[in-house]
Swiss-Prot record:
Post-translational note: It is unsure whether Ser-9 is amidated or not, it is why the two forms have been synthesized. The non-amidated form shows a weaker agonist activity on the zebrafish vasopressin-2 receptor (V2R) (EC(50)=3.6 uM). The state of the C-terminal residue does not impact its 3D-structure.
Modified residues (Serine amide): S9
Gene Ontology molecular function: any one: toxin activity
Tissue localization of expression: Expressed by the venom duct.
Family: Belongs to the vasopressin/oxytocin family.
Coiled coil spans: none
Organism per entry: Conus miliaris
The record's note on its domains: The cysteine framework is C-C.
Function: Shows reduced activity vasopressin-oxytocin related receptors. Is active on fish receptors, but not on their human counterpart, supporting an evolved role of this conopressin in the envenomation process. Shows weak agonist activity on the zebrafish vasopressin-2 receptor (V2R) (EC(50)=1.72 uM). Has no effect on all other receptors tested.
Keyword terms, alphabetized: Amidation, Disulfide bond, G-protein coupled receptor impairing toxin, Secreted, Toxin
Protein name: Conopressin-M2
Major site of localization recorded for this protein: secreted
Record's GO cellular component terms: extracellular region
Amino acid sequence: CFLGNCPDS
């Protein structure tokens, strides 16, 4: 996750 960006991986 990066700055709340958690796609699927």
